[in-house]
Amino acid sequence: MQERSVDPRALGAAAVKAAKHRGVDVSSGSEVTEILISDGSIGGVRTDKTSYAAPVVVNCAGAWAGNLGPQQFPTRPVKGQMLSVAGGPRNTPRHVIRSPEVYLVPRSDGRVLIGATVEEAGFDKRTDPATIEQMHRAALHLIPALGRARILEAWAGLRPGTPDNLPILGPMPTPGYFVATGHFRDGILLTPVTAHVMAQVVTGAKPEYDISAFSPVRFQA
């Protein structure tokens, strides 16, 4: 079976556009600094710019999720460095290629993504030139013609890790407070099913899938 890939940036932009089309108010460029409590239940969120009142809050803050809200839970950032190069007709793979050192992901716009590291480096999102060069060399070992490709970009992201390497999904003890995080390297791939099951949980419906093993309260003594 041929392996496919998803462009997280394109998917994110499309999701925002679709949400706005359905009448959802989207606020970007603001940092959530506090989850508000009112009479023992969720009251909304405070950002670095304003506050929003709401009876339900879903914490999807990734590696930062565990430090927000009335009850904390263990999440940690796991750094991943990547780079992209400008592919061409003769050096762009038609499918995902993997080796023990690196993987290559072709994009529809001609780019080739090369990744990715797994680093316990805290919230440091800086790229390391030596690491980027090492991944580039590993990619050239798989496709030597990429040596003629121009490096377009290098970046680092922070994946949300958990102590047992499982996602954190479901309600917290505070009424109206829900969590969806901890997907590590598979967050973008699990977005559809996560959104589907969390919508059921938030609206009080029985989840289509059993997510009890992912409950955020499993970490509480």
Report each predicted region and the residues it spans.
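Helical element adjacent to the flavin cofactor pocket in flavoenzyme catalytic cores
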Residues: 1-48, 52-56
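C-terminal catalytic lobe of FAD-dependent flavoproteins
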Residues: 143-221
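Active-site catalytic microenvironments for nucleophilic, acid-base chemistry
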Residues: 18, 60, 64-67, 197, ...
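Hydrophobic/aromatic beta-strand patches that form the interior of the parallel beta-sheet core
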Residues: 27, 58, 178-180
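Generic structural signal for well-ordered, non-membrane alpha-helical segments
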Residues: 4, 8, 12, 128, ...
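Active-site substrate-recognition segment that forms the wall
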Residues: 52-175
